[in-house]
Amino acid sequence: MITIDRRVQTKCSVLGRHKQVFIDMNETVHHQGSFFGRRKGHKLRAHQADLVDNLLPHLALDIELPAPDALAELFDAPVEAVRLEIGFGGGEHLIAEALAHPEIGFIGAEPYVNGMAKILARIEDQNIRNVRLFAGDAAELMAWLPARALKRIDLIHPDPWPKRRHWKRRFVQDSMIGAMARALIDGGEFRFVSDIDSYNAWTLAHLLRAPEFDWTAERADDWRKPWSGYTMTRYGRKAEREGRRASYLRFRRIAA
């Protein structure tokens, strides 16, 4: 058994529903290349391909250019703040948030072209104007973002990469926690949702040892139940049908 900080061990065991889930915090996992695997799945339908070819260029961020001093400049209409969702999948959560909060600008990062095609169709159908997209590696986007630029970062049901040799592909790494701390405003939040206990434990262990973040949970229901206004994704509904319960973790950026 690996010995880790008592505070980390206790809370990880809680998230594991009293199963002992131990994470070796002495093992350093370095980021080498992309956090993602394959980038293309099923062949796109004709209209989907047309959206990728013609609508995406108008919404896509070009990180070859310098980032604006204020991310609000990326949006046609004035926005009060900017949020980021990493790996939005089919876009259910991101679209619901964009519609519910027209005063907020949203950036969605997704490397898979099929997911990008799905969200483009929703953006076109509902004439959504407060979303910009990045079709690439979120690590590169994080490096491009200006400091203190984001109000919130969401990571909803990410690929858990369960095999040990693939852990370096998980988004939650010390390097990315540092990048999020740089990009978030003081009091901003990183929100994480997963139905995989080992990835919840991994995330909690990493964030608890990060001096820039504070776990906001005060009672079990704070992580057992979705936060107010949360939109369940297609994957989340599938997990529930199969008997897997998600955890909903929220971490606040501590003022520097």
Swiss-Prot record:
Say yes or no: keyword tRNA processing present.
yes
Q: Which InterPro entries is this protein grouped with?
A: SAM-dependent_MTases_sf, tRNA_(Gua-N-7)_MeTrfase_Trmb, tRNA_methyltr_TrmB_bact
Question: Which residues take part in binding S-adenosyl-L-methionine?
Answer: 85, 110, 137, 159
Tell whether S-adenosyl-L-methionine is among the UniProt keywords.
yes
Q: Which domain of life is it from?
A: Bacteria
- A GO cellular-component term linked to this record: tRNA methyltransferase complex
Q: In which pathway does it act?
A: tRNA modification; N(7)-methylguanine-tRNA biosynthesis
Q: Which family does it belong to?
A: Belongs to the class I-like SAM-binding methyltransferase superfamily. TrmB family.
Note the PANTHER family from the entry.
3-DEOXY-D-MANNO-OCTULOSONIC-ACID TRANSFERASE/TRNA GUANINE-N 7 - -METHYLTRANSFERASE, PENTACOTRIPEPTIDE-REPEAT REGION OF PRORP DOMAIN-CONTAINING PROTEIN
What does this chain do? Catalyzes the formation of N(7)-methylguanine at position 46 (m7G46) in tRNA.
Q: What is this protein called?
A: tRNA (guanine-N(7)-)-methyltransferase
Q: Which organism is it from?
A: Rhodopseudomonas palustris (strain BisB5)
Name of encoding gene: trmB
